[in-house]
Amino acid sequence: MPSLLLSLLLLQVPIICAWLLVRFIIDLTGKNGTIPTIRRWPALFPEFLDRLSYNDNAAQLVEEGYRKYKDRPFRLLKMDMDLVVIPLKYATELRAITSDKLDPLTASFDDNAGELTGILLGSELHSDAIHRRLTPGLRIPSTKYCRILTVCAFPERVGYLTDVIGNWTPVIPYELVLRLSTRAAARVFVGETICRDEVFLETCSSFSRNTFDTIATFRNLGKTIGFMLGILTPSVRKAREQGAYVQKLLGSEVERRRACPDEKHDDFLQWCIDLARTEQEAKPEALATRTIGILSMAVVHTTAMATTHMLFDLLADSKLRETLKKEQEDVLPSGWDGIDQNSMLKMRLLDSLMRESQRINPVGEFTFRRVVRKPITLSDGYQLRRGQQIAISARRINMDGATLEDAQTFCPSRWAQETQGASFSHSSSSNLHFGLGRYACPGRFFASYMIKAITSRILLEYDFKLESGREGYRPPNSIQGDKILPNRDAVVLFRRREVSI
């Protein structure tokens, strides 16, 4: 097997060298004179060197571009594409442009290493299912989803936390929350039977990790090289094996449900079955792939990152931790037996912390990723050309003192006294990380419920502290190109308290 892999690698070398030469020539002959380019290397060097070094310097390049060209577009040279960063002043008119002109699906496909992962391509079926079935259900005054999120996430007690009151257990928070998120979301996405399948649950958690590692590799290598060498990468091979397992499992479930039309199911998989409009969308394997892709990456992975960031924020501030615990006790005086939608809405300080934590620690530098499908002339005459990839530098905008007072300061209660429009899940030009317009993240309301459910229950039932015992210390983030991750190595000690649930 190793010799076969080596042979395949050697066969790829001439192709890669030829591609690098072509890319070098394109850089020399295809200069874009209308958009300033932010470079790490001096102008006399080829742009290809900037592409190679982008991931090591992304944060500094974005900061420099925003500082110099805050009110005009600038260009970044990524390994797999040119990215045109659009200023905030265009946000209002861009959000109204339809997907036939500004394509969010292809941009998401490219950003998620679609050639290697095979997720999120082809249609907006998943968005339709969330908009038309999931989100309306969250708005109904009911305990249904609140109970699902907490009971399924914490089955009888969390097996990877000690069940013995008073004992400290070492835990890696990201892994803990990844498992909790998977359990909570699986019930809503695949139904009651499959959500209890431990192999499926572990596969979903592992698929999230492997897919993210695949995406990181893809961004380092670029689209062409990544596609050619991807099959040699362990995370790619493992993710594909897991994808095949899920295709078989969920594909069989789709066929079984179609054979038993009298059965009633209320989950994401069934919503996609019901709402599929084309033959391709309705294929069992396509439904399975879409379900695992959305569940693992759009729901579980992003929820796990946001919740882990918040836990680290709480670790660094014992006063905040106690204040939030008091809020949960006031909102839920009888414990989780009394949870409902109204209780979730009363968690104003927790919601404020969620938004502020995401402002400081978003998933990445950019939002509103789009591919320009048709030429667009904006109100001031600026033209977007067909084929360009564009994005808005959400992180820099939200950290700009001209946009937000005292923007460099982390203030957990910043949004607690504001109106509902300032909530974590509200999408606007002042809360950009969920995107803008009709294509803003459709699952942000469900994500808000998940994060609140998991964090609130941890606050009510557990004490936690850093294994190192360092007070006031927050484990540093991990930066991968223009993506921002919580520390996935920090060890935290958890101890269950005596509570009445």
Curated annotation (Swiss-Prot):
Its EC number is 1.-.-.-. One of its GO terms (biological process) is secondary metabolic process. This is Cytochrome P450 monooxygeanse terP. Belongs to the cytochrome P450 family. It comes from Tolypocladium album (Soil fungus). The chain crosses the membrane at residues 2-22. It is found in: Membrane. Cytochrome P450 monooxygeanse; part of the gene cluster that mediates the biosynthesis of terpendoles, indole-diterpene (IDT) mycotoxins including terpendole I, terpendole K, terpendole C, as well as the kinesin Eg5 inhibitor terpendole E. TerP has dual activity and is able to convert terpendole E to 13-desoxyterpendole I and paspaline to 13-desoxypaxilline. Terpendoles biosynthesis begins with the synthesis of geranylgeranyl diphosphate (GGPP) by a yet unidentified GGPP synthase. Disruption phenotype: Leads to the accumulation of terpendole E. Its main location: membrane. InterPro entries: Cyt_P450, Cyt_P450_E_grp-IV, Cyt_P450_sf. Keywords: Heme, Iron, Membrane, Metal-binding, Monooxygenase, Oxidoreductase, Transmembrane, Transmembrane helix. One of its GO terms (cellular component) is membrane.
